[in-house]
From Swiss-Prot:
Belongs to the MukF family. Residues 208-236 are annotated as: Leucine-zipper. This is Chromosome partition protein MukF. Interacts, and probably forms a ternary complex, with MukE and MukB via its C-terminal region. The complex formation is stimulated by calcium or magnesium. It is required for an interaction between MukE and MukB. It comes from Photorhabdus laumondii subsp. laumondii (strain DSM 15139 / CIP 105565 / TT01) (Photorhabdus luminescens subsp. laumondii). Involved in chromosome condensation, segregation and cell cycle progression. May participate in facilitating chromosome segregation by condensation DNA from both sides of a centrally located replisome during cell division. Not required for mini-F plasmid partitioning. Probably acts via its interaction with MukB and MukE. Overexpression results in anucleate cells. It has a calcium binding activity. The keyword Acetylation does not apply. Keywords: Calcium, Cell cycle, Cell division, Chromosome partition, Cytoplasm, DNA condensation. GO terms for cellular component: cytoplasm; nucleoid. It is found in: Cytoplasm, Nucleoid. HAMAP family: MukF (MF_01803).
Length: 440
């Protein structure tokens, strides 16, 4: 949980004043990692210049570079790393030509990122979460006991700040490294499929399953410990509020809760994204297999034609008679020339003629309301008209009558915004909702 007290302009001015810069080609980076590995084997953490030259010689062998003038090139590399504040040089008057070198925090941080952070395993994560759980439990008990400001700072704030927060940062950094490993696995799978996908299927399956299993184990470990960690953080938060509340503790607990939520959610998100990638790879492989069937057939056919005189062959062709489609494209869904008898009421007229007659009759009947300026109760009029017609015509009659009525005028009640009452217009459940038309 890093906190930066400097502002951006202050940091920019500081970097410019000290002329900070880092340039690490792959050879220099390998040299730095070699120094870190050899340095970890020493109890004092110090290395002489001759030992650094030997390490540089091993790096040159690894890159198949010439061993001529190794001492000069090693001296240039050492001086460059001292200038970039990756190494500290210590000299004395008694041994001017035998300086001692130690890695700086920057050099240790870079080498640690490329070496130790790669060792991201379920066991390491479990140990980190176990330490965090123990620290949080002790801090929660100390918070519930209460005490003065010194007690809160020593037994609650300090463990959260310098132990729990740093382990959370380490887990977060490890998860970011895991993201890079997933990207590296994707690149390996793409390279395998581009070379020879048939031989690469087994390797791709192994890479996919190993990564999926690792992500699943890590997520199970996080979920198992996440609830307990959150519970202890809530205990500390409640005890802090009951005791009057320390702003530093409250802010730190909130930051830790956010960090823990982000750590746990990372696992599930990584699993979901990897499942999607897994499906994409398998779909690609299936498509490649389907395409390769045709490619193999065409290749074998081409070879057979080329070597026909050496290995004659016969080709048997099966040509079945073509099936003709006898459907009529102009055939309508419903034949107009239907058989059967029409009802007597419809025997002499078409449907459109009925609608025209109804429209004329209703229009003439409704004109009386406009001429006499009488209010038109649409519900009552509809009920009277529908009673004069069979049920089969109720819908058409109602539609025509409403269409003619709204052409005559409007209802003042429509502008009030109040809904009209539902009125029954026949004995079969049909209803209408309309205000009385009173303005023509």
């Amino acid at each position: 949980m890093s906190e930066y007290s400097q502002t951006v302009p202050e940091l920019v001015s500081w970097a410019r004043k000290n002329d900070f810069s880092i340039s690490l080609p792959v050879e220099r980076l390998a040299f730095l990692m070699a120094i870190a590995v050899l340095n970890s084997e020493r109890l004092d953490g110090e290395m002489s210049e001759s030992e650094l030259v030997d390490a540089f010689r091993e790096v040159c062998k690894g890159f198949e570079q010439t061993t001529e003038s190794v001492a000069v090139r090693a001296n240039n590399a050492i001086n460059d790393m001292v200038r970039q504040k990756l190494l500290n040089r210590f000299t004395s008057e008694l041994a001017d030509n035998n300086a001692i070198y130690r890695l700086t925090p920057l050099g240790m941080g870079i080498s640690d990122y490329y070496i130790r952070q790669r060792e991201f395993s379920t066991l390491r994560l479990s140990m980190q979460l176990s330490v965090v759980a123990s620290e949080l439990h002790r801090a929660a008990e100390a918070a519930e006991e209460g005490g003065d400001e010194f007690h809160w700072h020593r037994n609650v704030f300090a463990p959260l700040k310098y132990s729990v927060a740093e382990i959370f940062d380490s887990i977060d950094m490890s998860q970011r490294v895991m993201d890079e490993q997933q990207s590296s696995v994707k690149e390996d799978i793409a390279a395998l499929l581009n070379q020879d996908w048939q031989a690469a299927i087994a390797n791709c399956e192994q890479l996919l399953s190993e990564t999926s299993g690792t992500l699943r184990e890590l997520q199970d470990t996080l979920e198992a410990a996440g609830d307990k960690l959150q519970a202890n953080l809530l205990r500390i938060q409640e005890a802090n509020m009951d005791s009057g509340g320390s702003e530093l503790v409250d802010k730190l607990v909130f930051d830790l809760q956010s960090k823990l939520d982000r750590i746990i959610s990372w696992g599930q998100q990584a699993i979901d994204l990897w499942i999607g990638y897994d499906r994409h790879v398998h779909k690609f492989i299936r498509t490649a297999i389907d395409m390769d069937k045709n490619r193999i057939f065409s290749q074998r056919l081409r070879q057979s034609v080329q070597h026909y005189f050496d290995n004659p062959w016969t080709l048997t062709i099966a040509n079945a008679e073509r099936l003709l489609d006898m459907r009529d494209e102009e055939l309508t869904l419903r034949n107009e020339e239907v058989t059967g008898e029409l009802p007597l009421a419809l025997e002499y007229e078409e449907f459109s003629e009925i609608n025209e007659q109804l429209a004329e009759m209703i229009e003439k009947a409704l004109l009386i309301y406009r001429q006499e300026q009488r209010p038109l109760d649409l519900g009552a009029v509809l009920r009277d008209y529908l009673a004069q017609h069979p049920l089969s015509r109720h819908f058409d009659v109602a539609r025509i009558l409403v269409d003619q009525a709204v052409r005559l005028g409007v209802a003042e009640a429509d502008f009030s915004g109040l809904p009209a009452e539902w009125l029954a217009i026949n004995d079969y459940g049909a209803k209408v909702q309309a205000h009385v038309i009173d303005t023509y």
